[in-house]
Amino acid sequence: MMFGNLPDVRKPKEGYKKYLEYFDLRFPRIQEEKHFQSYYYYTYLKQIRISIIFLTSVLFIGTMTAYISPLDISYLPYYDSKNIYYFNYVQPNVTTTSSSTTTTSSTTNSIDSTVENNNFTEADGHLTNYYFPYLANKARDTFILRMITIGLLLFYFIFTFTAKFKRLWKLFTTITLFLVSCIVLIFESDIRTIPGRMVLLFIIIAISSGMTFLPSMLASGGLCLFFFFYFMFYSQIAGKQMVLLSLVLLISWIILMIISRFKEQLFRDKFRTLENLKIQTIRSEKIINQMLPTVVVQRLRLQSSKDQSLETTLENDKELSIKKDEESNLTGKKQSKVVVSPPPPPTAAAPQQQDNEISTPQNSRKIVDPQSPSSLMPGQYSVTDLIVDSYDPVTVLFCEIVNFNALVEKMSSTQVINLLNEVYNSFDRLTDVYGVTKVEHIGNVYMVVGGCPELCPDHAQRVAHMSLGMLSVIRRFGIVQVRIGMHTGPVVGGIIGKKKLSWHLFGDTINTSSRMASHSSIGRIQVSHPVQQLLRPYFLFEDRGKIQVKGKGLMRTFYLVKTKQLDKRYTSIFSSLHREKPYIPPVDISEVSFENQNNTIGKGDDIASGSATGPTHPNIPNSMLSAIPSRVSIEMNPLGGSGSIQKRERKGSIFANVMPPKVLNFLQTGSLTSPQQQPLPQQSNSEETISNSPRLSSTPQSTSTLQHSSSTGALGSLINNNNNNNNNNNNNNNNNNNNNNNNNNNNNNNNNNNNNNNNNNNNNNLPVSLISPISQNTTPTGSLSLPVTEKKKQTVQFGSISRSSSISKGTVGRSPSPALFDGGIEMDDNGGGAGDDFNTMEPNLDLGKGIHGSNVISTNNSKLNKLEKDLTKHYTLDKFKLSFISRGNLVEKEYRNEYILKNWNRILASMLMIVALFGLSGLVDYFFLKLSSISSIVKVEPMPSSSSSSLSSSSSNSMTSSEEKFITLHTIRSEENLIYDIITGVRYGFVFFCLIVIYVVSKFKTFSIRKWIQEVVMVFFIVLAAVLIVLTSVPPLNKIPLDSVILSIEIMFITICYNFSGIKFWYSNIVCAFCIIFIEISKTWKQAYHSRDIYLSHNYYLITAVLINIITSYFEELFNRLNWVHGRLLDKDQRETESLVAEILPADIVKSMKSGRQLIVDEFKNVTIFLSDIVGFTEMAARMSPRQLVETLNQIYSTFDEIAQEFGVLKIATIGDAYFCVSGCPDKDQTDHAFRVANMAIKMLESIKSIRTVDNIPIRMRIGIHTGPVIAGVVGIKMIHYQLWGESVQITQQMESTSRADMIHVSEDTFNILKSKYLFEERPDGIIKKRKIKTYFLLRALTENDPQPEVKTRSVSVSKSNFGGSLQYNQITPTLNLPVSQLIIKDQNEIKNQNDHDNDDENGNENGNESSSSNINEEEEDDDNSNNNNNNEDDESSYEDDQEMNQYLNNSENNKNNNNNSNQINEEDGNWAKNYDGSSESS
């Protein structure tokens, strides 16, 4: 299932209900259906009003035309024997001749002249008195009734602007259209105008009214019933002809209803696409922000987009040049090849201009194509554009779980990971509460930083509150013991490598913070002296004195105790947490948090409305905000979202899971009492601080800030769809509606806000805990910054980017606004200026206001509008030609190909529809022709029998008048019937020919033929319309009034062609033009035989229907193209997110999260772990600048990433200068995991030889490999990544730390797997920090020329009670044939220097590598009691281990001379040993 798709949870219907699903297009979820109805209403509201005006105009013009120039219906024949009023035929004086042919010809001419001269007389005088009793007053009554109807329509048009119309607009519109359509048919006595009039009314109701399928079907269906009963019972028109006419209208109604349903389904598909795109965008941002900080993501997007825009432009130019070359080769013209040279790189000022440019091919501006590779694909940025920034100062916190190894021994692996997941989830939520950034968690160490990547001056206070909150949470778990350390100083942050993108911090501050945690006491917070200096005015400390810090010497440290300002309340509440019943909060990975997007401030006009009287807040009295000046600056959300200032408590949130009710009440109100009993304090001057939270502190700055931080959901919640976003969309939205409506009324802005708050949802209260003071020049993401006194614009430098003090709108997590890149938008004191520009830039379309008056999808407004505006950046659409002009003709071809494949069945169905109408018109015309000729309406008495005998006896005698008339009319009728039969046969023969054509077209398989289907359909429609007109215009049919049926059929042809055929808009215009030409020629041909008035009426109906279809077809074509682009953006965003997640998490883990698995933990019995470390990293970092250091690491790790990907090894993480990989998990099918890792390690050692530092010093590294069981999984909800736990990880780290430079150190388990294919050297000093493990150095892979001798190698076991060494012989093959004496370093001081050097390397791992080492080597610190004495004991223990190793080396050196039976070393190995000794000394 795709990330953004909403699953269908409807139950399958049975019985007759399943057949009703065709008419029920509603979404299965009530909330989603409400969103759609609201969105549909505000999208089609203008079209509804336009349809009312159009219907009013049509009715008015038709009424005036009928009143001024009424149709002449005195000679109109009616097509049924019961209703035909016969006329006596007055035979003119005609000269009788002996020739029957002459007589027949003269008689026919006399009949024609009689018809033309209207020489009919009433037979019985009841035509006027009986059938049309109201003929005298018909025109007057019709005029009065229709003018009243026009007045009612105008009143209804005004009614559409009221609030009551919005609630039942479908019902009102349905009733109105039905009544108006019925009134249009009343007093209509000319049956020739009824078909065209009915079809036009159907088109207005079904297509142009803007109503959905069911209301349109009800209104038009009611009109059909009215038509049938009115003309059948009131006008008394009945018989076969009336039934056939009704059949034509019924088929036309069915076809129009199919088109109406199709259009609604198309609109619903677009809405679902936009909803999925919106949800996918939100979830993608949340997922990405869980992997990387928001600021880093935005900079990475911006930078990658610039690089890819150039690449895309070059690729498009190349494609166009290749296309031109191919065309020239086909035409035989020789053209010179086009050589595309890349444009010069943009300057420092160029990027901002390029971002604001709209991509058009005319000005050759850069195009950002959503079909191009992901804008967030890793490795798309160059070394010169690394995401690296320096931050000074920041506060770093390390929290270490001390008894983690003890928990692992006492509890099962699943229980330990569950516990760890609960702890880290609680910590992750606390980072949102206190506004700090989680860097990462490594094993049992949790790292937090304040002040970067988002700058804030109170970073130390935030981190201090975070540390106290972490202790309060840990007390609830009972069995977990932690120690916390803090330090303040400068750091460097950036992203390195091509795989497993992660944001790391580098610098001595990180190392010192790790030391503060490792030297702290259990349950205490140890801070350095710089931190104590920053927090001294706000917190109480306990002076610990000077302690010996590993790698730092003596440092003065302090224990953080509690706060000063909130002494009683804070300490009493949080100290009572451990007395409550231990409670582990439930994990709900399917929980989705959409507060940031759903609870919004509003758009630009919302803020502009309050600019005159100052900023407002829905839950703060105006008296408190009266002192706040109105000059503020606004930051726009990169995604166009709205800022969140309200939060509704929901089940499973941070406040419900982490904090008990007492603390929750305190966080909301600042008091232990109920929220109703604790009023907000009044602000008297600018020096006072608005705060009632645990983070309250008096700052010297003369600023006041209202901050709101919201928590982010879990990654699983972002992947698995949840209905919380739909359920929360109904809240907090009336404020936005009223603010939008009162945009221009600045004087009443505050009153409107207060009224809205009193009338709207009561659950949307802003927790007071989210209010904290920070300075004016800082805007934490997700906060509302209200400057109090200073109006001077202040900026904070972030690398090369500056940002102004602003109001953050709708940022995701703590995402900054585009003001970082494009600058903020300022509003003057009078509310004008840039505020108007903001409203112009992002207009309020009021999308999604609910049926019951609530803005149920206000979130969609800015999101969908922003998406609509972004289309011009991705695709350039020519709105006149309705074609894409981006990238030459490539985009247009791609759209056309996909459109044809998607709408193939629809195109064939449209062809069947017009063929069915063509055949139906032939059937109807046949029965009309039988009874519509002049011979059928003239009453002829039967010829007497005497005439028959006299005719047979004497043909030469002259005939009587009646006999001559009978023979003449009988001959005419026989000739006409023969012609009618021939024409009908030709029609149905053509119908069968068309069916054969459709069958042949449907069998087209190759796309090279299918791509011409639109042209084929266009010709098919034109030919069918021409045949229909021609067959009804040949003599004698040109003298018969068949235009009423033909007109309705042609209008249906045009409607199907425009709205259902699936051909291009301009092709439909060509078809329509030919239809109009054919009809007009036919009318001109028939005009000599019929009245001109009826043709004027037909032209009126025809032109009106054509205009309606042109407008609707144009917008449908535009609609389809925009919807296609939305789908491409959705696919692009999904690909980007999945690509990024795949780079950070394994594919199997992503699938598990998609399936709804809440906790991802697995046990693997046999995997191979790889860990490398750079030798002398501390000295190397001291010689290089921070940026040079990060660039060097990026070069190294990018190379390693490519090698790891080549061998299919999974990169776990980079920890400072350590590179951590694993093979064999999570893919259990990798049985050759040890060989993969071994080959990768060998190639890494070869590749790193070509990398040097800036001072041309080669880089050397140590590698450790071990094979064993591990526990792997994902814990936490922020900055998550795939992790490993277990003893095998610790052994691997020890293998690396005890290895030698440029050597691959493997354990015995790995050696047993690889010994048959690789050459090894046994390491005799086999003690690995309290572990008796045989270890080996992997040299290279075996070749065919290498001998495989079986030799006895030495394995050493050392006992702690006896410092001597014992030698044991085991048969192990193959190994390097070297004497032990050559493998032992002779100088004991060299061993000591090597160990010291390794310790320095550990100290130099500047991204918590020391913390990682402390995580893995917990055996040395399990018994710490968190005091200085225990730390000294650790040093003594470490010293004893060194003495044991030295004593063993002495014994080995003494026994060296006794080893006379050792094999001789060859020259190559001797050189290697010599080089190794020299390299060790140099290192």
Swiss-Prot record:
UniProt activity-regulation remark: Activated by guanosine 5'-3-O-(thio)triphosphate (GTPgammaS). Inhibited by calcium.
UniProt cross-references to Gene3D superfamilies, sorted A to Z: Nucleotide cyclase
Swiss-Prot/TrEMBL catalytic activity: GTP = 3',5'-cyclic GMP + diphosphate
Membrane-spanning ranges: 50-70, 143-163, 168-188, 198-218, 219-239, 242-262, 907-927, 982-1002, 1016-1036, 1040-1060, 1061-1081, 1094-1114
InterPro entries: A/G_cyclase (IPR001054), Cyclic_nucleotide_synthase (IPR050401), Nucleotide_cyclase (IPR029787)
Effect of residue 504 to D: Catalytic activity preferentially toward ATP instead of GTP, still activated by GTPgammaS
Disordered: region residues: 323-376, 598-619, 672-838, 1348-1369, 1393-1483
Induction (free text): By cAMP and osmotic shock.
Alphabetized GO MF terms: GTP binding; guanylate cyclase activity; metal ion binding; peptide receptor activity
Biological process annotations from GO: cGMP biosynthetic process; cGMP-mediated signaling; chemotaxis; lateral pseudopodium retraction; myosin filament organization; myosin II filament disassembly; receptor guanylyl cyclase signaling pathway; regulation of chemotaxis
Annotated residues for binding of Mg(2+) 2: 1173-1174, 1217
Segments of skewed composition (Polar residues): 355-376, 610-619, 772-786, 1354-1369
Signal peptide: none
Top-level enzyme category: lyase
Cellular component aspect of the GO annotation: cell leading edge; membrane; plasma membrane
Compartment(s) where it occurs, according to its Swiss-Prot or TrEMBL record: Membrane
Cofactor(s) recorded in Swiss-Prot or TrEMBL: Mg(2+)
Positions that bind Mg(2+) 1: 1173, 1217
Keywords annotated in UniProt: cGMP biosynthesis, Chemotaxis, GTP-binding, Lyase, Magnesium, Membrane, Metal-binding, Nucleotide-binding, Repeat, Transmembrane, Transmembrane helix
Annotated membrane topology: Multi-pass membrane protein
Family: Belongs to the adenylyl cyclase class-4/guanylyl cyclase family.
Assembly and interaction partners: Homodimer.
Name the UniProt record assigns to this protein: Guanylyl cyclase, membrane
Organism: Dictyostelium discoideum
